[in-house]
Amino acid sequence: MTLRKLTSALLIALAMPVAALADSDRIVILHTNDTHSIIDPYHETGLGGVMRRKALIDSVRNNEPNVLLVDAGDVVQGSLYFTLFGGEVEQKVMNALGYDVQILGNHEFDNGMEPLRTYLEGLNADLITTNYDLTQSNISDLFKPYTVRSVGGKKIGFLAINVDPAGLIDAAKSQGVSYLDPIQAANAVAWWLRNIEKCDYVIALSHIGYEEGNKADDILLAEYTQGIDAIIGGHSHTLIDPSAPDAKRSRFANLAGDTVVVAQTGKYGANLGEVVINLNDNSVTSRVIPVTSRLDSHIDPQLAEILRPYKTPVDSINGIVVGQTTQAFNKKPQMMNWMADFVMTDAQRLAKQKIDMSIVNVGGIRSTFPQGNITKGNIMQTFPFDNHEVVLAISGAHLAQALDSIAATGGNGVSHNVRALMDVEGKRCLQVTIDGKPIDPNRTYYVATINYLAGGNDGMEPLKYGMIVARSDNYLYDDMLNAFQKGFLRKKKLRPDSTVRMKQ
């Protein structure tokens, strides 16, 4: 072995536990969550990338006899690979990496049920959901309420807890999906796995978030169930690194007083999670392994060949410059302000009338603008959803309720002419002005937004009472590209606006 190869091998080995080569008295569960179609290393951090992830997974498998690989949802949506190819790339990647178990995230539903079935039926992993009743859907035959894997002479039972779709997933894109109480479902199936399937260990894969306030989350799941050894979570993009000085809490007592480990890797494949079950004392530990450039010399040529025909068009779109910025934008408030102002200005063109204000959601922004050139790829990746601009005619009373809904979530994006003082704990706005004037509950306002919010999703139920008076036929990112290439943003250098328009 050359010195260079030896050095590379040592770098990989540093990611492994010291006793890994000698130990066979443990089970290693590798896990990911919320990778969001980030196939290449993420442009903002340089971390992640499926080539590196596979190198790390292969290294663990080569050094550990008892390994399982699982994912906790939101494999898709967030890059050009999904926008252009609709899940085909992610399907091939998950199979190439050899995932054993996968669950649904909310973004798996983004393209609707028929495309979802096409994506799911091509996966090799076991597909499970414990608290979605899918009997009225077109994917019911693809899922089981749990799965059992035998490894290291032990039986490992997996169950899956999914997020409440109400107000989060467009109902038109999730037909036939019924939500069941997550705590009741988890307790029932955990009991079944322990007592009927005779599992030695039970792992819950979840896509409900680590700490969600008044909603079901991983902390609640840990504390109000029994029989579950670990929860491998997703949805909230939480990094739980027990070695960090400011680490999120990772160990909780369940109903029986037993310890439950809660794990999550953050987002975008920046880390690979590792949950280890010690077969000598039945203890469970967790950690995260950063997916960095140290792995670049260990890429799998077969995976590279799988990706090659998809990477070429993605790289081409990423090379088309459409605009410029004076400096990099942060997500909140700068990207949020820019999106809100764009939607308001462009909607005036669409509706051919004065627009009173705009409302957008931070969840609709998946990336940020860099300093310098903005490319077509930047726009499509930052605003990847199939949203359309709409203009609502809505009463001042219902508009005020919508702004209260925004306050309940800590503030979303509003146009530059809006100022609000929020009481987040009280879930209301104490004071709101539009163009310096308070909202008149009896007046009709014309509000620019996106169809997803106009449908009452993402907590914006009051907007359902408005009437759509104008709707763009284009996706939002196409309207943006048109504005950059031949509209009001042509040859305009963007400057970030850091004004906090809704204050606490």
Language-model features: where?
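Gram-negative bacterial Sec-dependent N-terminal signal peptides
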Residues: 2-21
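Active-site-adjacent helix-turn-beta-strand microarchitecture at beta-sheet edges
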Residues: 24-26, 31-41, 68, 76-180, ...
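Sec/Tat-exported extracytoplasmic proteins
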Residues: 36-39, 43, 57-64, 106, ...
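Hard-cation-handling environments
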Residues: 284-374
